Design a protein with these regions (language model features):
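Post-HEXXH active-site segment of zinc metalloproteases
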Residues: 226-248
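Noncatalytic N-terminal accessory/assembly modules of large enzymes
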Residues: 1-36
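Long, well-structured alpha-helical subdomains associated
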Residues: 4, 208, 255, 259-339
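A short secondary-structure junction motif
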Residues: 223-227, 231, 286, 290
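An active-site-proximal "capping" alpha-helix that borders the catalytic cofactor pocket
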Residues: 243-260
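Contiguous, non-catalytic segments that form substrate-binding/exosite surfaces or channel walls
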Residues: 32-198
Length: 339
């Protein structure tokens, strides 16, 4: 939970916290758009130290951090919180991440039709060991906060968490591991790739922007349409195979929309190009990366990939013959859309 019950280390922890708080105040002068958050974070650290390192409560600083309000390409942020990391540490440690926003012009235009105001695609600049993991997201839900009764609320009003208004997705890490795994998997399976798919695997920035487009549409779909299970089960990702269906639902929605965009002559050429690349990204991430790099136990992302592979095989657009994988690229989009 982030608390430090061992009193014998409180002195050295207090010295460390004083250093963090001082650094945050110093850095606040250099990052004007994060100034309120950084100063609030320094206070939260000092309050935690003064409390004797009980369970940390960073409610105020988390409430002050709003990267979603300044989605301009290259905008830097420093994020410091006691937090756990998805696919990483389940304990709450103080983690620091320096990141920058990825927001190409075509995404800014696309978002007018695919509104997702909480979506914050980012790339790593530097990070503490909690992100030396498979984690490719930074979510406010992972930060140590204690629910509070809203100011001015009626007596008896239950305590609430702050409103979570953003979610950070590290498109650079997604793109890099996608390129590495898919390049090797296509060589092992002797899959002949079209020229634009080869370019996607060779170009990191191209892959990053492709993932931003995919994530923009995928992420918003989690809040739209019919869920395949009770929404209260989302946090638990249970039962895991049904969560695989939910991930497939969002991926197939993104795929379908990108097929529409790629075929619409009224859409600009850059957006149409990335709409075609997203189709490769969805296919390869699902049939290669998730099953190959994830854990073998209760891996809902892998289940979704296996379902897609099986459907494409049954529909005769994917063939595994004499240890070689072949795909009917012309027929593929409509078959995936039919699923």
């Amino acid at each position: 939970d982030g608390s430090i019950p061992e009193k014998s280390v409180h002195k050295i922890c207090a010295i460390a916290v004083a250093g963090i708080a001082g650094s945050l105040r110093e850095i606040a002068d250099s990052i004007e758009h994060d100034r309120e958050y950084l100063l609030s974070c320094a206070l939260d650290f000092e309050r935690w130290s003064d409390s004797g390192f009980t369970v940390p409560d960073f409610f105020d600083s988390l409430s002050a951090f709003h990267p979603e309000k300044n989605r301009v390409d290259g905008t830097p942020h420093l994020v410091v919180f006691p937090m756990y990391t998805q696919n990483g540490s389940t304990d709450r440690f103080v983690e620091a991440v320096v990141l920058e926003i990825i927001w190409p012009e075509f995404i800014a235009e696309l978002e007018k039709n695919y509104s997702n105001p909480a979506f914050v695609p980012v790339r790593f600049i530097d990070f503490t060991p909690g992100y030396l993991t498979n984690s490719a997201v930074i979510f406010p839900e992972s930060v140590a906060v204690t629910p509070r009764v809203p100011e001015g609320a009626e007596p008896g009003t239950p305590a609430e968490l702050p409103v979570f208004s953003w979610g950070g997705i590290f498109a650079d890490r997604e793109a890099a591991r996608f390129r590495k795994v898919v390049q090797t998997a296509s060589e092992v399976t002797r899959l002949e790739l079209p020229a634009d798919a080869q370019e996607l695997l060779q170009n990191q920035q191209l892959a990053e922007h492709t993932f931003v487009m995919w994530d923009l549409i995928h992420d918003r779909t989690h809040m739209r349409g019919d869920l395949p299970f009770d929404p209260f089960m989302i946090k638990q990702r249970m039962p895991f195979f049904l969560y695989g269906l939910e991930e497939m639902r969002c991926d197939l929605t993104a795929f379908r929309e990108c097929v529409k965009l790629s075929r619409d002559k009224s859409v600009d050429a850059e957006t149409r190009k990335f709409a075609s690349l997203v189709q490769y990204a969805v296919l390869f991430d699902r049939i290669f990366r998730f099953p190959l790099t994830g854990t073998r136990k209760r891996n809902y992302d892998s289940v979704a990939g296996q379902l897609l592979f099986a459907y494409l095989h049954k529909s005769h657009v994917l063939h595994w013959t004499d240890t070689q994988l072949t795909i009917d690229w012309a027929e593929l989009p409509d078959v995936v859309v039919s699923l």
